Amino acid sequence: MLMWLCKAPPNVQFQFPLPFSARTLIKHLPSWKPNPFSRHRTNSKALTTTTRIVNSSHFETLDSRQQEQIRLYVDALLQWNQKMNLTAVKEVNEVMERHIEDSLTILAPIHKSYTSHCNTSCDKIRLVDVGTGAGLPGLVLAIARPEWNVTLLESMNKRCVFLEHAVSLTGLSNVKVVRGRAENLGHNLGFREQFDVAVARAVAEMRILAEYCLPLVRVGGLFVAAKGHDPQEEVRNAERAVQLMGASLLQLCSVESQSPYGKRTAIVCLKDHPTPKKYPRDPGTPAKMPL
């Protein structure tokens, strides 16, 4: 997962209690830079993630309405979490650090890769968050990019109930909550190869995610997986699965941080060809028998 501390500028009243100093905040700011790969061929030996860019918190870039929507979402998340297992995090500042900033960090790889390799702007992106859980990162991305159409895909009914509540509470009109499994919806013509971008965070290993997500992505679209600081072995193991789904590994986008959580990586895949009709396999098979 991508996890970062948030920083509020001096002239902004932060909505959440922050138990640390401004000097500590500045010290923990993240940085990001893409590491490009060949579009059609992956070189395993070249899978490096040494990068440094981006120097500020993402929360502070949101306007006042978006910040209020985030506040409402976080409040609801912690309230509902007392009744159901939505997150292991119990405190507001931890939610901001481990979930909100983490989710917003995915925006940079999406923007950079989409504009560079998909031959179009990032306006009106159709994005699906596979295995969204509590709405991370999809609901947060929908707040940050109201011009995007975001689908939150979740198999558990109780989580879908929470997601519907959160969407209503925050007043989002660009979000659709869908209850279902990726293995089934990957064969549904209303979902198969209908999305510009698929994202997944803290769901499964890359071999499994490729089969879950890439059948939902249109040819020429992207799949972005949020992973840990050193995903190279996982990426190498997933090369065959990615290729079988009609895609290629495009780049690793690494975020460098001095926070206790260290460096995190977004793995970006480009959909080159249609996914063969036999994929995804039956529900449960990708997890039990990864490609």
Regions found by a protein language model. Give the residues of each.
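N-terminal auxiliary segments of SAM/dcSAM-dependent transferases
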Residues: 2-94, 98
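Conserved beta-strand signature within the Rossmann-like core of class I S-adenosyl-L-methionine
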Residues: 220-233
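Conserved hydrophobic residues forming the short capping helix/wall of the S-adenosyl-L-methionine
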Residues: 81, 166-167, 239-242
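SAM/dcSAM-binding transferase cores
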Residues: 2-20, 26, 30, 236-291
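Conserved SAM/SAH cofactor-binding pocket of Class I
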Residues: 104-203, 210
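Short alpha-helix immediately C-terminal to the canonical SAM-binding loop
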Residues: 159-161, 231, 235
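A short glycine-rich, Lys/Arg-flanked "PGG" loop and its adjoining helix->strand segment in the class I
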Residues: 207-223
